[in-house]
Amino acid sequence: RTSLDEGGGALMDLGSHIISLARFLLGPIKEVVGIEENNISARLDKNKKLKKSEIDDRSIFIARFENGITGNFEACWNYYGSNMNLGFEITGSKGAIKFNQQRMNELELYKDGFKGFSRIEAGPEHKPYGNFCPAPGHHLGFNDLKVIEVAELLLAQANNKTCFPDFEEAYKVQLVIDAVKKSSKEKKWIKIHSL
């Protein structure tokens, strides 16, 4: 991709997933301030011709959630040495938790009073994970997640229920993306509801 009308850059492509995950874990985002950067000035277009790139390669922003939590976000296409670094780290007054999709079967947990993080390997004792992994050490992969997502969608349709994420969630994620883009242009905090 080289232009916004082709779908956008790193923020839309990668950032949308971590925004949705953050909203799921921490709640609605109130306001953002951010920057978008274009580090690669030209790319091959779909016809293999070099074309000026108008999209972001890297987007960094700070978000304030409605519950008072502050989060730092980054989406980048050109982080070399990392294949799938979609993840989060949440720290609080009594500990912290880390997740990275490259190691999607593990969580790292830090509890106050202990030195360092402990690794928790998901297994049969962690519901509903055990439905897919009958014994410790048998892990889910990315393609397994896609099968689970399709199953959730079909179950929701069969039971006349809404599954998550839905179109309303996608719209709310897009509002955050639009606010980051506006903040990058105007160089100031943007409230999500002001769009």
Features from the language model and the residues they span:
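Conserved loop-to-helix N-cap of the C-terminal "lid" that shapes the substrate pocket in Rossmann-like
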Residues: 11-15, 164-170
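Short arginine-rich
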Residues: 176-186
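Predominantly a Rossmann-like dinucleotide-binding segment in NAD(P)-dependent oxidoreductases
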Residues: 1-53, 107, 187
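C-terminal glycine/acidic-rich active-site capping loop/insertion
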Residues: 41-67, 88-89, 94-168, 190-195
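A general structural signal for well-ordered alpha-helical segments in protein cores
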Residues: 18-19, 147-151, 177
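Glycine-rich phosphate/pyrophosphate-binding beta-alpha loops
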Residues: 74-83
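Solvent-exposed beta-strand sheet faces enriched in polar/charged residues
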Residues: 33-35, 74, 193
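Beta-strand scaffold of nucleotide-dependent catalytic cores
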Residues: 72-75, 99-100
